[in-house]
Amino acid sequence: MEQKAKEAASHAAIPVSISAMLVTLGVVYGDIGTSPMYVTKALVAGNGGIGSVTEEFVLGALSLVVWTVTLLTTIKYVLISLRADNHGEGGIFALYSLVKRCGKWLIIPAMLGGAALLADGILTPAVTVTTAIEGLRTIPAVHAVLGDDQGRVVAITLAIIIVLFLVQRIGTAKIGHAFGPIMTLWFLFLGGTGLFFVFQHPAVLLCLNPVRGIAFLLSPNNHAGIMILGSCFLATTGAEALYSDMGHVGRGNIYATWPFVKCCLLLSYMGQGAWLMNNAANPELMGIADLNPFYQMLAPGLRPFAVGLSTVAAIIASQALVTGAFSLVSEASRLDLMPHMQVFYPAETKGQLYIPMVNNVMLVGCVIVVLLFQNSAHMEAAYGLAITLTMMCTTLLLFFYLHEERKLKVAPWIFAAFFLLLEGFFFVSSLTKFFHGGYFTILMAALIMGIMVCWYNGTAVEQRQFTLLPLRSYLPQLKRLRDDDRYERMSDNVVYLTKDTHTDYIDRDIVYSILDKHPKRARAWWFVNVETMDEPHTFAYSVETFGTDYVFRVHLYLGYKINQRVNAYLRQVVQDLAATGELPPQTHDYSVYKDPGNIGTFKFVLIRKLLAPESDVEPSERTAITLKYIIRRAAGTPARWYGLENSNVSFEYVPLFTKFKAVNKMQRLAPNERP
């Protein structure tokens, strides 16, 4: 009962409604919803082309597609995975956070699966948009303009992708409301055109029998062998993104919309199959290079509308991966697998976020993919390999969630055995894609995982030396320092930003910075912690003075919609304390204003750790720390995250308090003596 109440509360912020369902259709289903554009095309090409199409092939291949979508998307993700949410957030990192206490080694499948999903997400916009734009060639008037010059297709594709990433900053809610009605029309178009051809050849419904798929997989007429599963898998690559996007739309809205989406998808696949059975012997089709049944089965007058609609749907397909990537990186940052990055919340729901750095990196990656592979056939060959790794990792983590958190005994073992075996077949069948382009996503996944490993290991080394000191024990020293005229006053107010939320304790590095690294004399020291709240508009603070008028522990409680302008908020706190007499007036004689007020100057000190050359650490640890600090510099500066760009900020490096290597004692020589 407690578990069910917890789940219900986590999704209460996004109730099921027509509006939310439209957002769900616009944000979540783009990837899986555009699969009909290229799945049947890949199946036909893999079996030897239109000349090798038989009724056995069509029914067998479609049966494999139908049951791939049913088993992986419907059963594994919609019915099982969506139940495993972390305060409403989905995705492999949210799942790991639920089971990490079950074993430290589970961080490995979490990092591998997350890295593979992010890498595959870079390929998705390229392959879907390129496929849609290539559909223009099925329109004679447009083909006369474009011709067979792939460079023009590439240029149009790049323009669309760049615009897609530029509009991310306005938020997924606004994008979803714009895309939702279009995706509804898209799915109705898929279902309607598919149903039209199913009526013409009702025998295609025999593909719903799973025996047809298994029999064809083992049949000598299956020219692709087990590799046919690699093409079938393309029909469900968007399932993992569906799980990752749960925080944007809520589980209930996915439950409400998936039956409609699945029916339309299956009708489209069966409609293409029915058209193939009716036209397999058509000699005119034999001469069409790179035949795509999705476009070819449509009447010539309907193709311009279909190409235009599929282009927009392809853009929305990219959106599903982009929004999922934002959620994944946000979760990874909380788990200390990636650096902290600047995050914006354009909507009223915390799950809808925008991370500029992730957006820019994915944009560059998509552009590279388009320029490297040029056409959709090459991209399809690379597509899907990495995502099979993600699905296997998700299955493993779900096993521990069901077994350890849900306390189920037998069901988790059956679940893991079945889906790991099934996904293992898909992984083996996709391995042939490695040398045809799959290497790119594997290399990207390896790069992303390398960043995670370095950040995770580097953070582990730092945390081993992390120590909190009782702040009250240092009040006498701070009082003496405040009154010690031998040291020049650094500023009226010296401010440190802290990660820890303890009131009575302080990070040793901060105490070391104030007292040991050239004493930082001030009228008052401020230790400020910023906590982002689940409510969007929370705007409050608390202060602990320790009975002094020179040491202040400030907690800022800011809703996720509130800009973190620490300088401005701290000045308000100072004014409040000055008004109550808890802070003595900080008068100063020089100012551009006629009334300088009673608030003095501020100096913000941001701590950065430094590993000294003589530190006694393992070479692997030294490498991890060094690489972490390189990544940290690339990730941006806290001065920008906390709105301190125009403030007086200094970065101070403090050493990691590790053991130091013993050094030999030097021999002292006389002034004129030489060794």
Mark where each language-model region is.
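The structured alpha-helical core of multi-pass membrane proteins
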Residues: 2-675
